[in-house]
């Protein structure tokens, strides 16, 4: 994995209020995107790793940064949330609180 991939991921995470690394065929990704898109009104960025040439490298970079290789890989305001189960376990009020704090709703 390249230093460039890590820098690209860090830049994407830093430049979006909500960043999700996803794969189009992943049911957990779909659930996370559905939850977030129903609440987030401003700057939800989803990167579908299976639709881009450097998707595997991006996934490796995410593992290096977070210790998590699985998708979805979710960040709110630059903070690593985790996967779909982590997102869902926040509960609606805590999730909305985090999203409000970063200006995503």
Model-found features: residue ranges?
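A structure-centric feature marking long, well-folded core domains of fungal metabolic enzymes
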Residues: 6-18, 57, 93-96, 101
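Thioredoxin-like thiol-disulfide oxidoreductase module
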Residues: 49-69, 95-104
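Local sequence-structure signature of Cys/Sec-based thiol-disulfide redox active-site neighborhoods
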Residues: 5-47
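Non-catalytic, surface beta->alpha helical segment in thiol-disulfide oxidoreductase systems
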Residues: 76-105
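Conserved, well-structured core segments
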Residues: 23, 73, 82
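Alpha-helical recognition domains of nuclear gene-regulatory proteins
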Residues: 12, 35-38, 61, 65, ...
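N-terminal organelle transit peptides
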Residues: 1-7, 105
């Amino acid at each position: 994995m390249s230093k460039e991939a890590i820098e690209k991921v860090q830049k994407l995470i830093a430049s979006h209020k909500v960043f999700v690394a996803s794969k189009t065929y992943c049911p957990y990704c779909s659930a996370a995107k559905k939850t977030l898109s129903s609440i987030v009104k401003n700057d939800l960025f989803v990167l579908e790793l299976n639709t881009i040439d450097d998707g595997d490298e991006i996934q490796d970079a995410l593992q290096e940064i977070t210790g998590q290789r699985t998708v979805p890989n979710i960040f709110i305001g630059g903070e690593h949330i985790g996967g779909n189960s982590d997102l869902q376990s926040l509960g609606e009020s805590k999730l909305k609180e985090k999203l409000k704090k970063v200006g995503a709703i």
